[in-house]
């Protein structure tokens, strides 16, 4: 029986860290890989690559824990989140705080194997990961903070590989923020009615009936910035083909969200994984050739 309880607790931790739902980690991973490949240029040193891949999964898990901790009093009132480990009592608040600290310490131990510039930048990464979940109480733009949190691995990657943060780094960081606002607005459209009832703020609420148009504008801006990054770094035609495919995926997402159906909006959000993957493949093939 004791073993069963332990197994149940581990399963609850597993759900709290969202290791059963990798989409968030993938949306964090792709921009990290973009940055590593552009900074190298090409295949980065294998240890640095391993540190960042492991760091992505650890910090995404930590972000999910602190997000659920921040939302623990709200999640019970939302149908989609009512059964999460914290509001359902499967994990205590103390256990969640302890798990967050363990994950952050493990991630920081990995960062300590890198250069000083990267270590210093990692402090901002922790601050963004902690602050983001609480922003939805105070501003309609928490998605901007999410974009900064998900994108902070970009300057860290450039710093780790080249000990510099050039213009391409910050353009990529900006592109990631715009992309995150677009895809997380799609995600927020799923919960918009519930969020309005409990007082949670989001860009989906802020944009209102202009949500689809603004998402489209953001997506076009992302593609334009990626083209500029390609030009600055002398990338080959393979990369520009990937930008075109990403544009087609964005068009497909626009089709999905046209009626603002919850399931379709969530499907559009998930589709962004392929956008990140396609752009990474374009970068990798461009440097390979």
Swiss-Prot record:
Gene Ontology CC annotations of this record: plasma membrane
Enzyme Commission code(s) on record: 2.5.1.39
Coiled-coil annotated residue ranges, if any: none
Primary site of residence: membrane
Regions that span the bilayer: 33-53, 99-119, 141-161, 163-183, 213-233, 238-258, 268-288
GO BP field: ubiquinone biosynthetic process
Requisite cofactors: Mg(2+)
Gene Ontology MF terms: 4-hydroxybenzoate polyprenyltransferase activity
Pfam families, A to Z: UbiA
InterPro entries the record matches: HB_polyprenyltransferase-like, Prenyltransferase, UbiA_prenyltransferase, UbiA_prenylTrfase_CS, UbiA_sf
EC top class named in words: transferase
CDD domains: PT_UbiA_COQ2 (cd13959)
Pathway: Cofactor biosynthesis; ubiquinone biosynthesis
NCBIfam families, A to Z: ubiA_proteo
Function: Catalyzes the prenylation of para-hydroxybenzoate (PHB) with an all-trans polyprenyl group. Mediates the second step in the final reaction sequence of ubiquinone-8 (UQ-8) biosynthesis, which is the condensation of the polyisoprenoid side chain with PHB, generating the first membrane-bound Q intermediate 3-octaprenyl-4-hydroxybenzoate.
Protein's UniProt name: 4-hydroxybenzoate octaprenyltransferase
Native organism taxonomy: Bacteria, Pseudomonadati, Pseudomonadota, Gammaproteobacteria, Enterobacterales
């Amino acid at each position: 029986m004791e073993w069963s309880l332990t197994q149940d607790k581990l399963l609850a931790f597993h759900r709290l860290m969202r290791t059963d739902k990798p989409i968030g980690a993938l949306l964090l991973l792709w921009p990290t890989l973009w940055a590593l490949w552009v900074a190298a240029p090409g295949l980065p040193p294998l240890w640095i690559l391993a540190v960042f891949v492991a760091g992505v999964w650890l910090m995404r898990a930590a972000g999910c824990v602190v997000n659920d901790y921040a939302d623990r009093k709200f999640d019970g009132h939302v149908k989609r989140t009512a059964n999460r480990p914290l509001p359902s009592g499967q994990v205590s608040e103390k256990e969640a705080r302890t798990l967050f600290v363990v994950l952050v310490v493990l991630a920081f131990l990995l960062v300590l194997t890198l250069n000083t510039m990267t270590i210093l930048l990692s402090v901002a990464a922790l601050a963004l990961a902690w602050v983001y979940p609480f922003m939805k109480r105070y501003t309609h733009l928490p998605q901007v903070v999410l974009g900064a949190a998900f994108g902070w691995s970009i300057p860290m990657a450039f710093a780790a590989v080249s000990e510099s943060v050039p213009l391409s780094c910050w353009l990529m960081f900006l592109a990631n923020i715009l992309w995150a606002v677009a895809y997380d607005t799609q995600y927020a459209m799923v919960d918009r009615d519930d969020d309005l009832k409990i007082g949670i703020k989001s860009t989906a609420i802020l944009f209102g009936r202009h949500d689809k148009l603004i998402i489209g504008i953001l997506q076009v801006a992302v593609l334009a910035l990626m083209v500029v990054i390609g030009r600055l770094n002398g990338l080959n035609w393979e990369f520009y083909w990937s930008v075109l495919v990403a544009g087609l995926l964005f068009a497909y997402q626009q089709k999905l969200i046209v009626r603002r159906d919850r399931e379709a909006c969530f499907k559009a959000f998930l589709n962004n994984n392929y956008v990140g993957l396609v752009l990474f493949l374009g970068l990798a093939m461009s440097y390979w050739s």
